[in-house]
């Protein structure tokens, strides 16, 4: 079966870096070094291998994030409301038909993340496609129609925050990455960062 061709101008990547990083002692996770590069740089490189247009959603250190060469957009709603607020910001700022999201603290991004998510969405005629590692879903790795923004804003304005509940309101497809379960590993503490860096020194990626 031939591979689906990604329409590059129809998908914008949104890197979610807007959290408080409380378990990291408040240090901005996307800017923490892993193998000599900020974690967000690893995510940028992976997404740029598939698509051209990227946005970075951040609520702190905006000037530092801007040095990576992509537009930096804060949450459109105050209060650190979680990933949905960042997704809404990305939808509003993008001009493409779809957005694809990935968090800044998961630097081992899957090969062909965008293509597999896009294939699942098109195949199922879905509104949103979400990554699944074979054991569980990873809802912040997702591709979705940008015209879902009004629905998302209604959800947030109603005081709702849970990403799974909003997804449940729409047609959902699942893209499986059983061959790359490590791709969804995230770094939430200095200890986890040190552990991952040690592993990468032994088995470079």
How would you name each of these model-derived features?
Residues 3-160, 165-183, 190-204:
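Nucleotide and nucleotide-moiety/phosphate-recognizing core
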């Amino acid at each position: 079966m031939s591979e689906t061709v990604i329409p590059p101008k129809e998908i914008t990547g949104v890197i979610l870096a807007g959290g408080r990083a409380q378990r990291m002692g408040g240090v901005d996770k996307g800017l923490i070094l892993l193998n000599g590069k900020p974690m967000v740089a690893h995510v940028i490189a992976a997404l740029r291998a598939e698509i051209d247009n990227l946005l970075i959603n951040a609520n702190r250190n905006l000037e530092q994030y801007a040095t990576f060469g992509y537009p930096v957009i804060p949450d459109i709603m105050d209060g650190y409301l979680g990933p949905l607020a960042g997704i809404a910001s990305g939808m509003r700022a993008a001009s493409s038909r779809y957005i694809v999201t990935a968090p800044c603290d998961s630097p081992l991004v899957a090969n062909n993340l965008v293509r597999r998510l896009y294939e699942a969405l098109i195949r199922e005629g879905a509104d949103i496609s979400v990554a699944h590692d074979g054991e569980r879903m990873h809802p912040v790795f997702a591709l979705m129609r940008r015209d879902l923004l009004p629905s998302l804003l209604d959800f947030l304005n109603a005081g709702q925050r849970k990403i799974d509940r909003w997804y449940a309101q729409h047609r959902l497809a699942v893209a499986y990455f059983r061959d790359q379960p490590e791709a969804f590993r995230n770094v939430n503490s200095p200890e986890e960062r040190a552990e991952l860096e040690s592993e990468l020194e032994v088995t470079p990626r």
